[in-house]
Amino acid sequence: MEIELMQPGEEGLVIDLVRAVFDDIIAPGYTREGVEEFYNFARVENLVERSKKDHFTLVAWEDEHPLGIIEIRALNHVSMFFVRIPAQGVGKALFQAAMEEIRKRVGTLNPLTVNASLNAVPAYERLGFSVQAGVQCFNGISFVPMARGGE
């Protein structure tokens, strides 16, 4: 497995993975409004635009197939984090690579936040995040605000 910054032209593969995992695991618990809101966020053109601004995306690859992705906004917020097959170490490796990328860019590790899907809370807790508030809902998307301290 190799982890690299997403390159121009790879956005379609990234979004295909994101949508496949979302459809299988997260969408069944969302309202129609929530699914539509997420699909609007997880569009190739929107990922391209975010990448030109203050986001970066890392992709875990195996034989030219994406295994997982993590998108970081403003060096302090996890925007998207999806792994095709959980409990194989891909998520942990992606997260560690994202932390190294942040350190490389700013010289230290900022505190991080995430709006975790309900089923992802235990995974984020294993990565050192803690719950900051109860379940929130915005535009049909249910999430738990979580944070992790910096260095």
Q: Which role fits each region the language model picked out?
A:
Residues 2-16:
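A short beta-loop-alpha structural element at the N-terminal edge
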Residues 54-68, 73:
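Conserved beta-hairpin
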Residues 19-45:
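Conserved GNAT-fold acetyl-CoA-binding loop/helix
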Residues 102-119:
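Conserved GNAT acetyl-CoA-binding A-motif
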Residues 88-101:
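Conserved acetyl-CoA-binding loop-helix of GNAT-fold acetyltransferases
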Residues 113-115, 130-145:
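Conserved catalytic-core motifs of GNAT/GCN5-like acyltransferases
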Residues 81-89:
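A short, internal acetyl-CoA/4′-phosphopantetheine-binding micro-motif in the GNAT/acyltransferase core
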Residues 42-58:
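A short helix-loop-beta-strand connector motif used in the catalytic cores of GNAT acetyltransferases and
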